[in-house]
Structure formats: structure tokens, C-alpha cells
Amino acid sequence: MATNAHICIVTGSHLCRNPRVVKEAGALDEAGYDVTVLGPVFNDDLRAEDRALLTETAWDHRASVDLRPCIEGTWARLRRKIGTHWTRWGGESPHALGYGVASTLRRARSIGADLYIGHEEVGTWVVRQLLDEGARVGADFEDWHTRDLLPKDRVGRPLGLLEDVERTLLRHAEHVTTTSKALAQAMASTYEAPVPTVIYNAFPWADREALNETPRDRDGSGRPSLHWVSQTIGPGRGLETLCRALQDVERPMQVHLRGQCRPDYHDRLDARFPSENGHDLFVHDLVSPDELLGRIAEHDVGLALEQYEPESRNRTITNKILHYLLGGLAVVATDTDGQREVADKADGAVRLCAPDDSDELARQIRHFVRSENSLERAQSDALRAARETFSWEQQAPRLLTSIETVLR
């Protein structure tokens, strides 16, 4: 290892919304590297959440752009708006990728790191520019940015610029990682590039030490509990299919959804939800990253209802399915390429169904809740899969090996 080598991680999100960056920074810091994370400040609330995370870290965090009310924030928002409009009119502007791309590049350049690692659209664009300037760079593709939206949603997205970033970094960056074998192989094939190192989006097994048995979500009825989590509760996330499936599940269930939900969509869910079958629906706000595992672990079955489209969603492995395993939940997941990869390594912990197939979803839910033995076996398999494969303790060595190869 290159002792005291300085690594700068560049991202376009807050730490509290970017656990992969937090885990990466922590692993590199523990390995002896000097680590700086460069990312934006959107508002005071998210900044406070970031600071809470940083109380237990030794690595440095710096603002790439401050979007709170100030001249810098106003200018960054204006450039983003102009860049998006320009792209919609047929141009290609990096400012359409996110806020503060120019200031992020300028501040990254001033750090003078031995290695820069780009995350998300802004971060990967920045390290692409630094590569041209002779810097040593790496990239993490948590998503396939050119294929992470449906066609109707790509207006204003600078796809040509993103393709250049992906192609160049996959071919020429010295350290490239992604979240699944399915995504790694697809991107490598598309760009005729080396296959990236796969680092699963896992969480530390040690996080289980903080779990307690005090329920915060469950209603105390003893009914089996289903849990679904995402940043946003809304259409196109499998919830309508879940409502149809529960019509064919005779055993009364409690269903817990966690995320930001608009009142009008909450009303639509209530209207669809089959409460006449004895099921109850609970909608919870998001909680801090430190609280999430404890909330997940209260429940019996986790729902990972991803879609085949866009392609990035089909190929990647999201945080939620691995968080469910770490929480000791049986999992019902749609059979995307990424989630098949998890199911293959998780024995009987994960049952698969096609997206929008309510009959099969109902059958897989019934499989887990038909008896205590069925559920306990699946939950035991989930914990074993988390401990042996899908935990950060198992994934971090792959990251460190790749970095050591670059900096030796």
C-alpha cells in the first residue's frame, strides 16, 4: 500500500443519501489512506444529517458547492437550469448533470490527490476531466447513467456526454467498480472495456450489534409483517401489484411502507389496499441511516419489487435487498438480473417473481408465511447469506485490493 496516499472521492449527493460513498471512505481511511470526500450542500437539514454521520469518522468532508441561499447557490441553480434547457434544445451541457459541476471540478483539482474516485453523474464527469489533465482516476458506477431513465424521462439528459464519460472511464480509469456482475458485464460488453470489479452494496455485519428488540413499527397483533422501503412511495414501484396480490393472501398481514409519500398517492393506495381481507397498511417516514436496519429487522418479509426497465434498474443490485438480508428478513423480489444474482447466492432466503405478476407475488408471500418453520428457515438463510457474502466486511477487501493495485 502507498502509505499516506491521498484519495479524493467526488460525488453529487449528500453523505446521508449516499451510503456507498460513506462505506468506501471509511474502508479507505481504516486502511491508512488520507481520504477527502467532496460533495454538495443542498440545505441545512441534509447538512445536519451529514454532520451527524461525520461525528464518528476521521476522514475529511468538503463542500463542492453550497446551494443554500447565497450567491454561489443561486448561480449554481441558474447554470443547472440553463444547462438542462440547452440540452433539451439539442445541445450537450455538463451543467445538466447536476448542481455545481464547474465548482466541483475546480475544488477537486485544488486538492491535488493521488487518486480521484468519481461517483454519480457529477463525480464521474469531474474525474473524466481530471483524467485528461493527467490525474490518476477511478470510478464507481452504482447506476448505468445512460440507461437509468425511461425514454420519456430522458429529455434534458446529456446522453452523448454521459456515454463519453462511461466509455472513457471504463477503458482508461485505473480503478472501476460497480454493484453487480450483471451490470459489470453489460457495461463492459457495450463499451468493449475491461469488466469492472464488483462490490456489492452491502452494509456492515457489525451494524447488527446495535439492534434491539423494541418494536417501533409493528402493531403488536402478531400478524406476519411485510416491509417495503424506498426514497419515494409512488407509482411504478410495484405497490399496485402488491395490493392486487394481497387480495389472494388469506392470512391477515400488516404491510409497512417507508418513504416520502404525497398525500394524493397515499389516498390512492388506501383505496386499492384490500383491508377487507384483514390486512392493515402502515406508511412511515424515512429514518436516519443509523435507524434503518433496526426498523427493517422488526419485520418478517422484505419486498424488493424492482422493474426490468430502465435497464440500469434491471442490472444493478439495490441497497434494499441487501439491507433486508442483513436484517434477517425473508425476501420476495422481482426477478431482475441483479436480484437473480442475489437469489443464487442466498439459498432459500429469496423467492422471485416477475414484475407486475400479482398471482406469483401472492404465491411467494404465502410460501413464507404458511408456517413458522418456513419463515424461520428463510430468515436463517438470509442471515447466513449476509454474513458470508452480502456484508461490507466481505466486500471491503475487494475495494482495498483494487486501490492497492493502483497505488502500489
Protein language model annotation of sequence segments:
Residues 345, 350-358, 367-373:
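Conserved acidic donor-binding segment of nucleotide-sugar-dependent glycosyltransferases
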Residues 24, 95, 99-110, 125, ...:
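Membrane-proximal helix-turn-helix segments that form the acceptor-binding/catalytic region
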Residues 367, 374-389:
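A short, well-ordered alpha-helix in the C-terminal region of glycosyltransferases
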Residues 223, 259, 266-296, 301:
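Nucleotide-activated donor-binding/catalytic signature segment of Leloir-type glycosyltransferases, i.e.
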Residues 182, 199-202:
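Carbohydrate-associated surface elements
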Residues 301-304, 323-326, 330-333:
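Short hydrophobic beta-strand element within catalytic cores of glycosyltransferases
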Residues 217-247, 256:
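Conserved donor-binding/catalytic core segment of Leloir-type glycosyltransferases
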Residues 42-44, 254-269:
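Glycosyltransferase donor-sugar binding loop
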